[in-house]
């Protein structure tokens, strides 16, 4: 919480507004909105404006609550006890609503828009509905057809048992083969897979293992490898600026889902991967 407070204080320093204003008024800067300078200035302005809308007290309370909630979630997940985590989730939702009120949203929008904008600039619930509503209609028909099929899918792979050490060696080999650079990253285990790091030469992946579910480890690792590949591919020369950062959550998730689903569930992938698994 103290670190969150310090970051908020630094991010909302009034001098930043002066610096941004001076840059925005500088006629010598490139006029092309796609130039490095223009992109950085636009994103720094956006970040500053959003940060100054939040009171420090709310930032601290959010940090304290989410930190404690994460520990409770880990224990609740381990015990399969949702009731233990539910009060923390309720509190996070209430704090998120307050956060949305601080940010504000257009008259035609809704509170979710204010929060989504922090993950994907300009994203709205109306836009998401326009994408997923017609997709859902087709998926319902597809699922009904599959559920009514007289040929059930084989569950052999999902029931395959493999010692954890062998699973780890397997998924490491696969993630390296699809491009993850272990000289600039690493893979560890956690209760829930994630990807993090400080820059594109230090990318940390985690996955999870279960002796009776190799598929979970492989899918999780491919998913996080997709995130890691995107991060490792960011331009190092722009490190520390918006130009050197990911553009948003949708692109990030498109890369993780590409490797987990489009590649990882394809016949071509398994034609290559199966011999490695049975070695």
Task: Set out the residue ranges of the language-model regions.
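Post-HExxH zinc-binding segment in Zn-dependent metallohydrolases
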Residues: 245-279
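Contiguous, non-catalytic segments that form substrate-binding/exosite surfaces or channel walls
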Residues: 62-216
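N-terminal helix-rich structural modules
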Residues: 1-89
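Beta-rich nucleic-acid/ligand-interaction surfaces
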Residues: 192-198, 242-252
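Short, glycine/acidic-rich hinge or "gate" loops at secondary-structure transitions
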Residues: 85, 109, 151-156, 238-243, ...
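Short acidic (Asp/Glu) and glycine-rich catalytic loops that position anionic groups and cofactors
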Residues: 45, 201, 233-240
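Active-site recognition of the HExxH zinc-binding catalytic motif
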Residues: 104, 209, 216-236, 253-260
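Secondary-structure transition/capping motifs at alpha-helix termini
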Residues: 177-183, 228-237, 263-270
């Amino acid at each position: 919480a103290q670190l969150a407070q310090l970051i908020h204080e630094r991010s909302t320093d009034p001098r930043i507004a002066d610096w941004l204003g001076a840059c925005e008024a500088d006629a010598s800067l490139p006029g092309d909105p796609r130039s490095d300078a223009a992109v950085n200035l636009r994103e720094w302005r956006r970040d500053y404006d959003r940060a100054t809308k939040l009171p420090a007290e709310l930032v601290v309370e959010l940090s304290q609550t989410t930190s404690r909630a994460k520990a409770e979630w880990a224990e609740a997940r381990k015990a399969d006890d949702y009731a233990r985590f539910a009060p923390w989730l309720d509190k996070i939702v209430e704090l998120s609503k307050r956060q949305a009120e601080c940010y504000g949203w257009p008259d035609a929008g809704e509170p979710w828009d204010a929060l989504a904008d922090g993950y994907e600039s300009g994203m709205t619930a109306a836009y998401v509905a326009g994408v997923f509503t017609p997709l859902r209609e087709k998926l319902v028909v597809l699922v009904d057809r599959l559920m009514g099929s007289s040929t059930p899918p084989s569950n052999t792979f999902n029931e395959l048992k493999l010692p954890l050490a062998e699973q780890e060696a397997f998924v490491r080999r696969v993630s390296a083969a699809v491009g993850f650079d272990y000289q600039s990253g690493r893979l560890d285990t956690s209760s829930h897979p994630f990807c993090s790091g400080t820059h594109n030469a230090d990318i940390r992946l985690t996955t999870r293992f279960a002796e009776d579910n190799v598929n979970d480890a492989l899918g999780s690792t491919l998913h996080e490898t997709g995130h890691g590949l995107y991060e490792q591919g960011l331009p190092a020369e722009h490190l520390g600026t918006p130009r050197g950062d990911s553009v948003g959550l949708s692109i990030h998730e498109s890369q993780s889902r590409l490797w987990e689903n489009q590649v990882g569930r394809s016949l071509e992938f398994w034609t290559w991967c199966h011999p490695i698994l049975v070695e």
